[in-house]
Amino acid sequence: MKREELLVEEIKDLTLEELKGYADFYKILDKVYGFTAESVVRGVKILKDMIKEADLRFLSFTANLVSTGLRGLFADLIKQGYFNVIITTGGTIDHDIARSFGGKYYKGLFEYDDSMLRELEIHRLGNILVPMESYGKVIEDVVRKYMNEIVSIKKEWPVYELLWEFGKRISDENSILKAAYEKKVPIIVPGIIDGSFGTNLFIYSQFTQLKLNLFEDMKLIKDLIFSCKKSGALIIGGGISKHHTIWWNQFKDGLDYAIYITTAQEYDGSLSGAKPREAISWNKIKPTSENVVIYGDATIILPILSASLLG
């Protein structure tokens, strides 16, 4: 196949506005009830309770979702004040910057020949196609363009403040970084160096006095945890973003509300597959908490949960 035959239909971001007509869709699932439908309905109830009752509300997600149309939905959830702390992975920053500064991602298929894609200089992320020129070079150019100006302000940065500086310089209304900057919602990325953005910061630091101070990010979370009355989390996916969220909540005896959206299973003992009941044994979720695991693809589940907030 030719490159132009593959890169046809661009990924577009979803907004809360587009979900207005689906606010009651979860009620249909409540009629169906069986199996996953029940857990989605329970998730809607817990999410609404959390937003109403918890003063500290975490949104935790993995980077792969930012390559999809969920990126715009994440931005809107921040803009509307539903969440006031974001915990995510290094790739989230990569994809958000790449797409904010002209990078285009395209619809594809899982089944494409990856050797062919490599020859055509196209990355594959599941069934999403990322032209090479839409990813690494875009991020490298953005870091090079803005870092001299940012380092002239100060040389040592907490990661969340550095990300606000980049968000300040983004005009794309679907950007997660822009939304977080405008609402002053901290984005905590414990694995910031694991990705293109972090690697470019490292390279830049070799020629300047740039320093990242992750302890300041930890201090911020510590202060938020110890000052809150109730905390809740919508945790999408697993890995470091999930663990960092529940880890810090053990210091207040656990989350009061927890919603997991996952496809991971617990039989292998992984953190990603661990259910809320296991986190209870670690004091990361309260025994009295409202909690649920929703098994399914977040690109389907999250729009349903988000739409319910509009009803």
From Swiss-Prot:
One of its GO terms (cellular component) is cytoplasm. The active site is at residue 284. One of its GO terms (molecular function) is deoxyhypusine synthase activity. Keywords: Hypusine biosynthesis, NAD, Transferase. Pathway: Protein modification; eIF5A hypusination. The keyword NAD applies. Its cofactor is NAD(+). It comes from the Archaea. It catalyses: [eIF5A protein]-L-lysine + spermidine = [eIF5A protein]-deoxyhypusine + propane-1,3-diamine. Catalyzes the NAD-dependent oxidative cleavage of spermidine and the subsequent transfer of the butylamine moiety of spermidine to the epsilon-amino group of a specific lysine residue of the eIF-5A precursor protein to form the intermediate deoxyhypusine residue. Belongs to the deoxyhypusine synthase family. PANTHER family: DEOXYHYPUSINE SYNTHASE. This is Probable deoxyhypusine synthase.
